[in-house]
């Protein structure tokens, strides 16, 4: 049955690992169309700090699901799954192969496994929880979560109000715990997927790449890009767009919480932490072929062979 399903390619990897270069090279060789799997690239006017493909790169290889939202908007894994499935269907209808490229592992997971039937956010209940936090403190609410959902409470730190609030909200809306609901899987992906991950073999090399890229972003005008966002006055640090690595730290600088140099240092450190989390995800991933960032030609041949042999 799976042999009759259309082929899709996943090209995953930590930030600054060379995914975009490899994807563009692959598109020049095969009838693939790129879908971005990146929770930062979805935002308009956030080009430099996200290392978004530039005009030349996009002319060589258009990317779907970039520049689709204003930074004031939110976008969930469910939104991504819906949009990615539509894009994949469109690509297959054109007789081409979907190539999904990026490092937002939660999006890949949602696409592969489907989504748990979690209730939509309820502003009234969320506001009620925030009010309780103001009067009682988040530690008391964390104790409440321990009583109803000890598994989630063990994973969520008392100083993580966003995740703590969501866990309580889910229970109050549905009467079921976050743990119960997340163990219920949705629809699996109706494609034959070949999965690849690219990264340098040496972690120090990845750190060097991250620092170099951040420095280049600053030279390219990241501070000016951030100032334009800051000046809008309708954005704030709790938005997913401003929580993106680099943007959060530059916002702190513009808010007067740190110096420019401190913001750059914090941004580099945060990007390294992101890369570490991405690699941790990938090491636990099944059916994955690893590629070496330091040998793009070999990586290209490996992916080419996978397509040609299909």
Swiss-Prot record:
Coiled coil spans: none
E.C. no: 2.5.1.75
SUPFAM superfamilies: P-loop containing nucleoside triphosphate hydrolases
Keyword Magnesium assigned: yes
Known catalytic reactions: adenosine(37) in tRNA + dimethylallyl diphosphate = N(6)-dimethylallyladenosine(37) in tRNA + diphosphate
Residues that hold substrate according to the record: 15-20
Cofactors named for this entry: Mg(2+)
GO biological process: tRNA modification
UniProt cross-references to InterPro entries, sorted A to Z: Dimethylallyltransferase, IPT, P-loop_NTPase
Binding site residues for ATP: 13-20
Pfam families: IPPT
Domain of life: Bacteria
Record-level Gene Ontology MF annotations: ATP binding; tRNA dimethylallyltransferase activity
Region feature (Interaction with substrate tRNA): 38-41, 162-166, 243-248, 276-283
Positions marked as site (Interaction with substrate tRNA): 104, 126
Alphabetical keyword list: ATP-binding, Magnesium, Nucleotide-binding, Transferase, tRNA processing
Cystine residue pairs: none
Family (UniProt): Belongs to the IPP transferase family.
NCBIfam families attached to this UniProt entry: miaA
Assembly: Monomer.
Purpose: Catalyzes the transfer of a dimethylallyl group onto the adenine at position 37 in tRNAs that read codons beginning with uridine, leading to the formation of N6-(dimethylallyl)adenosine (i(6)A).
Protein name per Swiss-Prot or TrEMBL: tRNA dimethylallyltransferase
Organism: Vibrio campbellii (strain ATCC BAA-1116)
Gene: miaA
């Amino acid at each position: 049955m799976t042999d009759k399903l259309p082929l899709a390619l996943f090209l995953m990897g930590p930030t600054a690992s060379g995914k975009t270069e490899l994807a563009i090279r692959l598109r020049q060789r095969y009838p693939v169309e790129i879908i971005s799997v990146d929770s930062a690239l979805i935002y308009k006017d956030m080009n430099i700090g996200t290392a978004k493909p530039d005009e030349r790169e996009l002319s060589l290889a258009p990317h779907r699901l970039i520049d689709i939202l204003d930074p004031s908007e939110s976008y969930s894994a469910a939104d991504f799954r819906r949009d990615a499935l539509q894009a994949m269907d469109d690509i297959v209808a054109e007789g081409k192969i979907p190539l999904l490229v990026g490092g937002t592992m939660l999006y890949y997971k949602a696409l592969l496994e489907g989504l748990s039937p979690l209730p939509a956010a309820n502003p009234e209940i969320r506001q009620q929880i925030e009010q309780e936090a103001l009067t009682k403190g988040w530690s008391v609410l964390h104790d409440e979560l321990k009583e109803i959902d000890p598994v989630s409470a063990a994973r969520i730190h008392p100083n993580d109000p966003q995740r703590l609030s969501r866990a309580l909200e889910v229970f109050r809306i549905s009467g079921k715990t976050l743990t119960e609901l997340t163990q219920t899987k949705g629809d699996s992906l109706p494609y034959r997927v070949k999965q690849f991950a690219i990264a340098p073999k040496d972690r120090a090399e990845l750190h060097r790449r991250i620092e170099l890229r951040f420095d280049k972003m600053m030279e390219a005008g990241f501070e000016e890009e951030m100032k334009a966002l800051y000046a809008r006055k309708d954005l704030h640090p709790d938005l997913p767009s401003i929580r993106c690595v680099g943007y959060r730290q530059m916002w702190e600088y513009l808010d007067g919480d740190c110096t420019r140099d401190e913001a750059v240092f914090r941004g580099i450190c945060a990007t390294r932490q992101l890369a570490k989390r991405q690699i941790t995800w990938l090491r636990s991933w099944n059916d994955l072929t690893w590629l070496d960032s330091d040998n793009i030609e070999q990586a290209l041949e490996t992916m080419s062979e996978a397509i040609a042999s299909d």
